[in-house]
UniProtKB/Swiss-Prot annotation:
Family: Belongs to the adaptor complexes medium subunit family.
Source organism: Bos taurus (Bovine)
Entries under InterPro entries matching the protein: Adaptor_comp_med_subunit, AP2_Mu_C_sf, AP_mu_sigma_su, Clathrin_mu, Clathrin_mu_CS, Longin-like_dom_sf, MHD
Protein name as annotated: AP-1 complex subunit mu-2
Biological processes annotated in GO: intracellular protein transport; vesicle-mediated transport
GO molecular function: clathrin adaptor activity
Cellular component aspect of the GO annotation: clathrin adaptor complex; clathrin-coated vesicle; clathrin-coated vesicle membrane; Golgi apparatus
Subunit structure: Adaptor protein complex 1 (AP-1) is a heterotetramer composed of two large adaptins (gamma-type subunit AP1G1 and beta-type subunit AP1B1), a medium adaptin (mu-type subunit AP1M1 or AP1M2) and a small adaptin (sigma-type subunit AP1S1 or AP1S2 or AP1S3). Interacts with P2X4.
Keywords: Cytoplasmic vesicle, Golgi apparatus, Membrane, Phosphoprotein, Protein transport, Transport
Length: 423
């Protein structure tokens, strides 16, 4: 059968949950599914199999959900569809009614079920009675027969070796959020997205258990049950070391960590976030022989925060020459091989506004108008700040020898794909 990944989408085609089984198809390919489906529907040629390039989407609709399997190969379609309907059957037995709300309210147990239902693209355990023997309604594993031996005794913690020793026991926690933004030439935000991750550097002796607590606001949002006006974290993924059943029960992120660097958790936030650095640009032409570009940058984040290493890349015509610059802060340089002016600002406080003017000789303005202009790109990094408001409340480190360890937390918001189109 060989399915590469399985997605569950809401009625608008937005991914609620997904499981990548083989890694040979980019998870972003699912973005093409809904536009394809709507196009075929309008043409009156809708089929249960849709294709985009080499990627095939095999899908069914149930209630207000789309279940989609992706594959590169000429898979056995009847088996794939049989498996998708089996997912519906199993989930319906677990959650009584299979709909968007039941997926959002039970995302941890859904992940566990998807892990058991399929392995490397092939159906594994699809009998709901067998699944219910060790995946309970609360997401706990039932203990059958003899009591279980702790994983550390059997060395079942494959991601961590025994006998690790450090003179100084420390844990460094980085909460990093990247801002993806696309603004059109009229100033309207076309895309606004936050991609976040919690990364750890672990220097701990022995076989410690760590418990990480996040602020309550975020925990409620992770469950999908928040009634208050709040942002919602999506596509939440945990490292394999996290005890999902424990998290599902009391929202505690409990784990025995790998040694060194690893990503504990990742998430996405799709919401209209106010652009942190706003750019306005004006182009003035003079006698078809020179052009003046004026760029205004404004920090639209808290005044007590500072953006570091700001780089604003402004496209210029390919035949521009004789550059001259004037900046209210920072420095500007012309990079002819990229047809770009890079305006660098070492430190950009929130609420501040700065100006840069660039003058170029321009022998052929008309040519540039036909070609159009690439967008302005912005790079930045803001420490001690997250857009989502996620915060680490505590980190408990438990190890049988009873040593004291120091946890350090750092928050960083940085630019991802941050572009503003120009007219």
């Amino acid at each position: 059968m060989s399915a590469s990944a399985v997605f569950i989408l809401d009625v608008k085609g937005k991914p609620l949950i997904s499981r990548n089984y083989k890694g040979d198809v980019a998870m972003s390919e699912i973005d093409h599914f809904m536009p394809l489906l709507m196009q075929r529907e309008e043409e009156g040629a809708l089929t249960p199999l849709l294709s985009h390039g080499r990627v095939h989407f095999l899908w069914i609709k149930y209630s207000n959900l789309y279940l989609v399997a992706t594959t590169l190969k000429n898979a056995n379609a009847s088996l794939v569809y049989s498996f998708l309907y089996k997912i519906v059957e199993v989930f319906s037995e677990y959650f009584k009614e299979l709909e968007e709300e039941s997926i959002r309210d039970n995302f941890v147990i859904v992940y566990e079920l998807l892990d058991e239902l399929m392995d490397f693209g092939f159906p594994q355990t699809t009998d709901s009675k067998i699944l219910q023997e060790y995946i309970t309604q609360q997401g706990n594993k039932l203990e059958t027969g003899k009591s279980r031996v702790p994983p550390t005794v059997t060395n079942a913690v494959s991601w961590r070796s025994e006998g690790i020793k450090y003179k100084k026991n420390e844990v460094f926690i980085d909460v990093i959020e990247s801002v993806n933004l696309l603004v059109n030439a009229n100033g309207s935000v076309l895309l606004s997205e936050i991609v976040g991750s919690i990364k750890l550097k672990v220097f701990l002796s022995g076989m410690p258990e760590l418990r990480l607590g996040l602020n309550d606001r975020v925990l409620f949002e992770l469950t999908g049950r928040s009634k208050n006006k709040s942002v919602e974290l999506e596509d939440v993924k945990f490292h394999q070391c996290v005890r999902l059943s424990r998290f599902d029960n009391d929202r505690t992120i409990s784990f025995i960590p790998p040694d060194g660097d690893f990503e504990l958790m990742s998430y996405r936030l799709s919401t209209q976030v106010k652009p942190l650095i706003w750019i306005e640009s004006v182009i003035e032409k003079f006698s078809h022989s020179r052009v003046e570009i004026m760029v205004k940058a404004k920090g639209q984040f808290k005044k007590q925060s500072v953006a570091n290493g700001v780089e604003i890349s402004v496209p210029v015509p390919s035949d521009a020459d004789s550059p001259r610059f004037k900046t209210s802060v920072g420095s500007a340089k012309y990079v002819p091989e990229k047809n770009t002016v890079i305006w660098s600002i070492k430190s950009f406080p929130g609420g501040k506004e700065y100006l840069m003017r660039a003058h170029f000789g321009l022998p052929s303005v008309e040519k540039e108008e036909v070609e159009g202009r690439p967008p302005i790109g912005v790079k930045f990094e803001i420490p001690y700040f997250t857009v989502s408001g996620i915060q680490v409340r505590y980190m408990k480190i438990i190890e049988k020898s009873g040593y004291q360890a120091l946890p350090w937390v750092r928050y960083i918001t940085q630019s991802g794909d941050y572009q503003l189109r120009t007219s």
